[in-house]
A protein has these predicted regions:
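Conserved nucleotide-sugar donor-interacting segment of glycosyltransferase catalytic cores
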Residues: 84-156, 211
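Conserved nucleotide-sugar phosphate-binding/catalytic loop shared by glycosyltransferases and other
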Residues: 34-78, 155-156
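Active-site-proximal region of nucleotide-activated glycan assembly enzymes
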Residues: 126-214
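Donor-nucleotide binding loops and adjacent catalytic segments primarily
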Residues: 208-313
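N-terminal subdomain of nucleotide-sugar transferases
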Residues: 1-52
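A donor-sugar binding/catalytic signature common to diverse glycosyltransferases
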Residues: 105, 299-346
Length: 437
């Protein structure tokens, strides 16, 4: 039996993907404590998990990336907010370790401060990764712009230029405050993005899998792809679903406000005269601002699991959580990215042929209606993604990897998804040395 402590960013989309893993660890006889936001605490406590709230100041930091005018500007705001959170996480994570006396740690990859404490603790630990990971690769485009993979000369030139522009800008933005924060507790400075995302944690549990995630020949050996991590809080049955006979379309906004309410408005208007039944959950947006047509039901929150069992399509902001949850249920997606990692998620939907993407600048009721029809025809691609998620092993595979880390056995066997001959992502210094040789 091992005492595990998990620590996440307080946003729901950061804690929900790891819940099945935590429940599986408990089923295997381990003790599990979770530090996260108040919003998730009550539901998780009802499941028997030991849940404690993170510092309330962490929850007061607003994600204001939606105010930016460009995708790059939004990413700069996002990483600056994460750095602000990180400074608060350091004493909070130290408090959690002192109270829980864990033997192994699981840390949200966006919790930069908690990760620094984990690194310095001397305990076995792992990152939980719940978004398309920004690790450079010879096989995939650079993170951030949602570029389609290209493997010809033009693609390689494009990727090199974009990597220098986007990743370089992000590194110049986030590394100075992160390294200043890390220096305060004696942690070494980070050299680049790969230093953090690929080489810092002994294990990185990546909650995704092929064919949704792009195939890479150079995954870091610390990575395990374990599937979607789809989870919903337990809820009462939705009896009204039994009366729905038309094809059901689920519309949903981000649970973390990003001003994406016009997605719901366009969907309600565009699908009002169609032979479908629309269920819209507005989440971070107040539902009182919308008119509800006769063929729709509008709520702020509903459990998505029972709805997905009946759904023909999901229209969403391309958040990683709802997108993978839909695809894990075999439901195709109409993705309308608004920012954050959503351009990357939406592009993966298209490349996997599991749905369509509609840029938010082209979001109109008529265009959305057409896109929903096109997405409904992608059920075969969604089924392939669902099969890939299931084959990755899910919570059982994640728990097994965590047990290996806790016991010191991780890395003794070749990971099943790492191609023969693959190697860890080299540091920037190593790459430059290779270029000079």
């Amino acid at each position: 039996m091992t005492r595990f402590l998990a620590y996440t960013n307080p946003l729901l989309g950061h804690v929900y993907p790891i819940v099945p893993t935590l429940l599986e660890l408990r089923r295997r006889g381990h003790e599990v404590s979770l530090y996260t936001g108040e919003a998730a605490a009550e539901a998780l406590q009802r499941l028997g998990l030991r849940v404690r709230a993170v510092d309330p100041e962490l929850e007061r930091i607003e994600n204001d990336d939606w105010k930016a005018r460009t995708p790059i500007g939004a990413q700069k705001r996002d990483v600056e907010n994460l750095a602000r959170r990180g400074r608060l996480e350091i004493p909070d994570m130290e408090r959690a370790i002192a109270q829980e006396r864990p033997e192994a740690l699981i840390v949200d990859v966006t919790a930069f401060g908690a990760s620094a404490v984990a690194e310095r603790s001397g305990l076995p630990w792992a990152h939980a990764v719940h978004f398309p990971v920004p690790i450079p690769s010879r096989d995939v485009p650079p993170y951030g712009l949602g570029l389609r993979p290209r493997h010809d000369v033009v693609g390689r030139i494009r990727d090199a230029l974009a990597r220098r522009l986007v990743l370089g800008l992000l590194e110049r933005t986030i590394l100075p405050p992160i390294n200043e924060m890390r220096a305060g507790i004696g942690a070494r400075p980070l050299e680049d993005a790969s230093d953090y995302f690929a080489r810092l944690a002994p294990l990185s549990l990546y909650y995704s899998a092929e064919p949704f995630e792009y195939r890479r020949s150079d995954w870091p050996p610390s990575f395990r792809l374990v599937g979607s991590g789809a989870w919903d809080p337990p809820a009462e049955s939705l009896d009204w679903l039994d009366a729905v006979e038309r094809p059901l379309v689920l519309i949903t906004c981000s649970s973390d406000f990003q001003n994406d309410g016009r997605l719901v408005e366009s969907a309600l208007t565009g699908l009002a005269g169609e032979d479908v039944f629309v269920v819209a959950t507005t989440a971070g947006v107040d539902p009182r601002g919308f008119a509800t047509p006769a063929n729709a039901r509008l709520e702020r929150y509903l459990p998505h699991g029972p709805i997905l069992e009946r759904a023909a399509c999901v229209v969403c902001h391309a958040g990683m959580g709802i997108t993978q949850k839909a695809l894990a249920a075999g439901v195709p997606v109409c993705a309308v990215p608004f920012g954050r990692d959503q351009f990357e998620v939406a592009r993966r939907v298209v490349v996997a042929d599991a749905g369509v993407m509609l840029p938010k600048g082209r979001l109109r009721p008529r265009r959305l209606r057409r896109a929903v029809g096109e997405a409904m025809a992608k059920k075969a691609g969604a089924a392939r993604v669902a099969a890939g998620f299931a084959a990755a092993g899910g919570a059982a595979a994640a728990a097994e990897a965590l047990e290996e880390v806790a016991s010191g056995r991780f890395g003794t066997a070749r990971l099943p998804f790492v191609e023969a001959g693959s190697a860890a992502v080299p540091s920037r210094a190593a790459r430059k040395a290779g270029e000079r040789s």
